Amino acid sequence: MEIIKTLGEFIIDRQKDYPDASGELTSLFSSIRLAAKILHREINKAGLADITGAAGDENVQGEQQQKLDVYANERFKNALAQRGVVCGIASEEEEQFVRFEETKNLGGKYVVLIDPLDGSSNIDVNVSVGTIFSVYRRVSPEGEHVTEEDFLQPGHKQIAAGYIIYGSSTMLVYTTGNGVNGFTYDPTIGVFCLSHPNLRIPEDGTIYSINEGNYIHFPEGVKKYIKFCQEEDDATQRPYTSRYIGSLVSDFHRNLIKGGIYLYPTSSRYPEGKLRLLYECNPMAFLIEQAGGKAIANPGQRILDIEPTKLHQRCPLFVGSPKMVDKLEQFISELG
């Protein structure tokens, strides 16, 4: 008889790897798990309830907020505040970081950075969306209010990161710096079950993911790499397959499983890149490196080594199978 291991059991088993955690990480993940279940329920009702479409406001990025963006942000914020182990969060949907003012939260060891609903514009057309999260140990003294410096830490200081993908099934994939594991939600019993242990990205792949509609705005090195992917060469299994959903979590998850590269370069429209370093690039870079992959912003510039200077800092992102990222890096180094 096959023994099913739940997310809660798995985290408790791994707690011995972090003797200083004293159960706080278990509690923190319990909050994330709860909010994910609530969001799973609401997303599955999209189209039946009045939760799709624009909310009528813009977020700090100047992007149209969807109703589910607002809903997801509130659910995760409330869940993380309840346990007392998190002293504050920073969200892609909020201009400033959020202090948790309760006395129990002042002693919290951790801060969480989150993109509550990545790809939310796809909800109306029933395309997979996701949540991305990142956990750091605070640098300010415990017992005091959280500060901006607690959030402006380089990615290599993350102690946990992950994403939840709401697709044909709902999955939670995470790392605490000791490999990557995936858990599929079973709504009949209300638990996440270990379904993808020790995830490893293939060293090479045949899928590239980029919005080619913006080709004219890309740097020359990226244009050359796209042409390389499209050329015919039996020895390298080219032409490669182009797959782009427009939801970072969905594109990343597919490439993690099958092997591939995701590209979001700088452009004439977005000279600093479009994705957010703290909410998207850092957690995905931590995950991919733990799965045997590679993530860079520019040639020789590892995502996890970038020192952030502001909460909503943007950054180019090239992430995926290491051999594909290395090849892209060659083109950018030569042509810019």
Swiss-Prot record:
Its EC number(s): 3.1.3.11
The species this protein was found in: Hahella chejuensis (strain KCTC 2396)
Binding residues annotated for substrate, in chain numbering: D118, G119, S120, S121, N211, Y244, Y262, L263, Y264, K274
Entry GO terms, CC: cytosol
Co-factor remark: Binds 2 magnesium ions per subunit.
One MF term in the entry's GO annotations: magnesium ion binding
Subunit structure: Homotetramer.
Residues that, per the record, bind Mg(2+) 1: E92, D115, L117
GO biological process assignments: fructose 1,6-bisphosphate metabolic process; fructose 6-phosphate metabolic process; fructose metabolic process; gluconeogenesis; sucrose biosynthetic process
Cysteine pairings via disulfide bonds: none
Compartmental location: Cytoplasm
Protein name, per record: Fructose-1,6-bisphosphatase class 1
Cross-referenced SUPFAM superfamilies: Carbohydrate phosphatase
